[in-house]
Amino acid sequence: MYYYIFDVRQCKNRRQIEAIKDRISSLGISGEFVIPDKIRPARDLAEQGIFKGYSTIVAIGADGLIDEIAAVMLAKQQAFGVIPLNASENVHKIIAAGSWEDAVENLRYRRITESRVGIINEQNVFFSYCQIDFDKPTSITVEFEDYLLQAKARELYVANRFPGLPKKDPSKLDIIMKSVDPKSDTLWGKLKSFVSGTHIVQDLDISLVRSDGLRIFSPRQLPILLDGRVFAKTPATFGVSQKTIRLITKRSSKSK
């Protein structure tokens, strides 16, 4: 049975709320609907749904709700479904659904993909990617297991899934950086790789490194953004979950 955690604030109006419920009902995948609030946050509701014995926990909402529930779903036998509302384009791509209607269809056919998530500071998870918020080019240090990389950066992304970038290794994060001087003789320059087909490829070289863990330091604290909201601040550690989520995606999707 299905357990829907529905952030109704993401709906345009009451009519859309009813349209989503009606579509779910018409496909024969009705279940219990609950609405998160300050007293009962999404994380608690997800744990409650698992305790009640529901086989599928579904997040209906934006990136923040999805990430919060994803943290609960790690290593659980229940399937995790997503119906994105005001969510990032990347979330739509991960589940291979162009609209909430498509996402509901995904639930009907229940193609399960074992998926990992990114982890910040060993406690918070991110489903897609996060971004260091630079108000100006800033010197940063990125520490990997065997080496350090230092550069003056203007953009830096740490991604579990990044728009337009094929996921080469599900057990690693993709670290993508725009440096101020792309021709500088630094390790970033030596390791640089062009990421074709993404929205960030413009006039600068892109440095790309894949790793299962890293730490980012900066002379001053920098916000770490997830879908436009401050999620954490530097210094911060990043990793990829060893456990997986049983994510429902489109039947023809090849994402892993």
Feature annotation, model-predicted:
Residues 5, 74-181, 185-189, 194, ...:
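Catalytic core of DAGKc-family lipid kinases
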Residues 29, 54, 111-112, 229:
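Residue-level recognition of short, well-ordered coil/turn positions
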Residues 186-256:
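ATP/nucleoside-binding phosphotransfer catalytic cores, i.e., glycine-rich phosphate-binding loops
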Residues 68-69, 90:
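Phosphate- and divalent-cation-binding pockets in alpha/beta enzyme and binding domains
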Residues 63:
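Polar, low-complexity loop segments and adjacent catalytic/binding residues used for recognizing
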Residues 59-60, 82:
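Short beta-strand scaffold positions
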Residues 37, 121, 143-145, 159, ...:
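A structural detector for beta-sheet-dominated domains
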Residues 1-57, 67, 75, 240, ...:
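ATP/NTP phosphate-donor binding region
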